């Protein structure tokens, strides 16, 4: 009786720790021989009807339980002398407290099932192999949830790498793609230093953006918000698109200026470009390089130079006094060095302001002789046409001073006309 009570006392904590998760499956453990005559487990060689290896592996994978899981469906029967040894072997690899039987005893159970020929009495050989279990430190939480405990330990052991996380850029790109319905390009794996994804605009969006750019180069914020709502884009995308488009426009204008250099210009096309570029140069928007004077034939430049042109009637006398100088200097005996050095501040402005250098009117007209200086009545640039004609009415034949009009305040006009006389070398020196 005392022996049975002792066995029951040993059995009760184990029964409280390990509930029906391991005991309610008699079919799985039916292969183990249990002799009711001696109340002991069949570990001797004639009593080893172990399941086949597939069944054993299924037991290992499904129920990575303790060594006590070998018990059959009648756990309340007090086993004899080997029951204490098994319980001891369950408790020994654990932490030493009452929960060690359920928690830290999983590795010995696996080893005892994987190595059936070993008898259980030498348990000290089993604990060294316990660290081979990958979840050895985790499963001491709940002894009764065998499969649940293993799955929870598997989920806990999952590591979240940085490239798995969703960054702010990726979430914004997903949202914009979903709202705009665009065909987004495949995103590269979003690493910490990944590049910003290029936005793919649809043709309808591009048409609307181009139309808006045609009317307004710079968008105010209310209009930008309106277009963002209209095109299903963000304000930032529209702002960046306009920035890029302005840069492209500037490059196109620069390329046009290089193409329309005086060496490749025709007379009918040069005067408008020359007049426009002359007024822009006088308003101080361009550096003193004559080749760049074509870059900005824009209406605001004309508006800036209008006040200077309206006051030209007062300068008819200096212009008339310039006429003999022009006739005198029109001969080709002048050396070209002031043109290369641009002769100081006002001379650079003269070089830019006059379509003689910029537009190239006189390159074709002055080649025969100095007389064709007076042929410029039909080549007047449009922006200063009204003032030029008033000057020409007062001083007949002086309309060639139209190039002087944008800068009438410079008193030393002789330098200007001498630079006009050196026109035949202008393309060679300024556009090499």
Curated annotation (Swiss-Prot):
> Whereabouts does the entry annotate DNA binding, in residue ranges?
194-253
Q: What GO molecular function annotations does the UniProt record carry, in alphabetical order? A: DNA-binding transcription activator activity, RNA polymerase II-specific; DNA-binding transcription factor activity, RNA polymerase II-specific; RNA polymerase II cis-regulatory region sequence-specific DNA binding; RNA polymerase II transcription regulatory region sequence-specific DNA binding; sequence-specific double-stranded DNA binding
Its domain of life?
Eukaryota
Q: Which regions are flagged for Polar residues bias?
A: 148-158
Gly residues bias located where? 97-106
The listed location of motif Antp-type hexapeptide is: 160-165
Which UniProt keyword terms apply here? Developmental protein, DNA-binding, Homeobox, Nucleus, Transcription, Transcription regulation
- Localization (cell): Nucleus
Biological process annotations from GO: anterior/posterior pattern specification; cartilage development; cell-matrix adhesion; DNA-templated transcription; embryonic skeletal system morphogenesis; glossopharyngeal nerve morphogenesis; Notch signaling pathway; positive regulation of gene expression
Cellular-component GO terms for this entry: aggresome; chromatin; nuclear body; nucleoplasm; nucleus
Protein family per UniProt: Belongs to the Antp homeobox family.
State the protein's name.
Homeobox protein Hox-D3
Q: What is the lineage of its organism?
A: Eukaryota, Metazoa, Chordata, Craniata, Vertebrata
């Amino acid at each position: 009786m005392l022996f049975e009570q002792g066995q029951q006392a040993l059995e009760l904590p184990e029964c409280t720790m390990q509930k029906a998760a391991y005991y309610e499956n008699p079919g799985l453990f039916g292969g183990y021989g249990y002799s009711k005559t001696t109340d002991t487990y069949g570990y001797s060689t004639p009593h080893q009807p172990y399941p086949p290896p597939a069944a054993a592996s299924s037991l290992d994978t499904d129920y990575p339980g303790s060594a006590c899981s070998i018990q059959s469906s009648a756990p309340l029967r007090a086993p004899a002398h080997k029951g204490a040894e098994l319980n001891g072997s369950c408790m020994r690899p654990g932490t030493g407290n009452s929960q060690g039987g359920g928690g830290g005893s999983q590795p010995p159970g696996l080893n005892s099932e994987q190595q059936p020929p070993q008898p259980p009495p030498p348990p000290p050989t089993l604990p060294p192999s316990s660290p081979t279990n990958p979840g050895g430190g985790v499963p001491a939480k709940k002894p009764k949830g065998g499969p649940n405990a293993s799955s929870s330990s598997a989920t806990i052991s999952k590591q979240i790498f940085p490239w798995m996380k969703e960054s702010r850029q990726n979430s914004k790109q997903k949202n914009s793609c979903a709202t705009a319905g665009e065909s987004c390009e495949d995103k590269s794996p979003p690493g910490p230093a990944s590049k910003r994804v290029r936005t793919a605009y649809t043709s309808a969006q591009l048409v609307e953006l181009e139309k808006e750019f045609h009317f307004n180069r710079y968008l105010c914020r209310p209009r930008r918000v309106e277009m963002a709502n209209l095109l299903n884009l963000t304000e930032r995308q529209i702002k960046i698109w306009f920035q890029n488009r302005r840069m492209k426009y500037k490059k196109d204008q620069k390329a046009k200026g290089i193409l329309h250099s005086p060496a490749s210009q025709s007379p009918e096309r040069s005067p408008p470009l020359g007049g426009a570029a002359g007024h822009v140069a006088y308003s101080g928007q361009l550096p003193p390089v004559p080749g760049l004077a074509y870059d900005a034939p824009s209406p605001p430049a004309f508006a800036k130079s209008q006040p200077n042109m309206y006051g030209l009637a007062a300068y008819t006398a200096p212009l008339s006094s310039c006429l003999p100088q022009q006739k005198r200097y029109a001969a080709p005996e002048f050396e070209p060095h002031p043109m290369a050095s641009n002769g100081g501040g006002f001379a650079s402005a003269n070089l830019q302001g006059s379509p003689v250098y910029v537009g190239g009117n006189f390159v074709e007209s002055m080649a025969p002789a100095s007389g064709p200086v007076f042929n410029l009545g039909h080549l007047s640039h449009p922006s200063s046409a009204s003032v030029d004609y008033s000057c020409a009415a007062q001083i007949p034949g002086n309309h060639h001073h139209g190039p002087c009009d944008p800068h009438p305040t410079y008193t030393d006009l002789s330098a200007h006309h001498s630079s006009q006389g050196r026109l035949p070398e202008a393309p060679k020196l300024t556009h090499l």
